[in-house]
Design a protein with these regions (language model features):
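Short acidic-aromatic low-complexity motifs
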Residues: 2-4, 10-31
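Short beta-strand edge/turn micro-motifs at domain boundaries
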Residues: 100-127
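A solvent-exposed, acidic/Ser-Thr-rich amphipathic alpha-helical stretch
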Residues: 6-7, 25-75, 84, 92, ...
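A short, structured loop/turn motif at beta-sheet edges
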Residues: 72-79, 108-114
Length: 127
């Protein structure tokens, strides 16, 4: 049975969180477009910025992302997802942190038919 387009987006989100938890940068990279942009409270991050940040954390923290998807809308080759996300960050040395909040993500379907993260407005704050 094939997945609906919404199901494919949900699967991508699950894969992203699993790969992030495992420190699997190659899988995460494959889930982003080359021109991905992350809008964060600290400013704009492009692909190279995200990769550098991911590499700095890999092996130094344990991550656990808990999504609460509120809405997914698919319009042709673009999909928008509103997600209430909670991320538990446990440094190997230091105090654990929890960040939570709204995330609005835009995905684009490539010529290969695969969905990839294209724009991400991440409003997580420490809780």
């Amino acid at each position: 049975m094939s997945l609906s387009e919404e199901g494919k987006i949900r699967e991508l989100i699950d894969t992203w969180l699993e790969a992030s938890k495992a420190g699997d940068l190659e899988t995460v990279r494959a889930l982003m477009t080359d021109d991905v942009v992350f809008l964060t409270r600290d400013g704009v991050m492009e692909r190279d910025d995200f990769v550098a940040s991911f590499q700095a954390m890999a092996g130094n923290v344990d991550l656990n992302g808990l999504p609460d998807i509120r809405e997914i809308s698919v319009m042709g080759d673009v999909a928008v997802c509103w997600n209430k996300l909670r991320v538990e960050i446990k440094p190997h040395r230091g105090t654990p942190k929890v960040h939570a909040g709204d995330v609005l993500t835009v995905f684009r379907r490539g010529e290969d038919g695969r969905w990839r993260l294209w724009r991400d407005a991440n409003l997580l704050t420490a809780v």
